[in-house]
């Protein structure tokens, strides 16, 4: 039996995207999927390029619609090197706040646009959580993951 595996790449400023990633990881582990939760400040581009497992990006948004500081180097390296990612399957769970409508969840949206432009295969439509709606992002994320992503891993 082949073990299922998922890499979760995290870009966060305050830790919310990491909390989301850890809750998804716990859900996966309870459902027969091994995970690696990797914060982007510890990632090199080759870890994405060489990935044989699906990738889930969890990213908050910072400033004026920016990728969080700990994800900037990784994002910029992917953007600069423009590797062919046609072998990568991915999805995105982005975090934002509709109070900032013009830049809502841009951290996650930027990763989605970049990965898609490099031919990565989207296995599920991204979800963008709105902090202003009062829901807990980790609960929303696990439900979204269970319904939309798990079946593709």
Residues covered by each model-derived region:
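FMN-binding flavodoxin-like domain, especially the glycine-rich phosphate-binding loop
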Residues: 2-5, 15-19, 29-31, 38, ...
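Short, solvent-exposed amphipathic alpha-helical segments in soluble enzyme
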Residues: 23-25
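Short acidic active-site motifs
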Residues: 43-47
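Local sequence-structure signature of Cys/Sec-based thiol-disulfide redox active-site neighborhoods
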Residues: 6-10
């Amino acid at each position: 039996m082949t073990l299922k595996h998922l890499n979760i790449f995290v870009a966060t400023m305050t830790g919310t995207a990491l909390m989301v990633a850890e809750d998804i990881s716990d859900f996966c582990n309870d459902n027969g999927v091994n995970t690696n939760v990797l914060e982007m400040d510890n990632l090199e581009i080759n870890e994405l390029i060489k990935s044989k497992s699906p990738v889930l990006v969890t990213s908050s948004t910072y400033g004026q619609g920016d990728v969080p500081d700990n994800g900037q180097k990784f994002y910029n390296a992917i953007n600069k090197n423009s590797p062919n990612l046609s072998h990568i399957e991915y999805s995105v769970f982005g975090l934002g706040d509709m109070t900032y409508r013009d830049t809502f969840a841009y951290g996650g949206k930027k990763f989605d646009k970049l990965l898609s432009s490099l031919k990565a295969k989207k296995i599920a439509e991204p979800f963008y959580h709105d902090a202003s709606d009062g829901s807990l992002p980790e609960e929303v994320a696990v439900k979204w993951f269970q319904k939309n992503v798990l079946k593709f891993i």
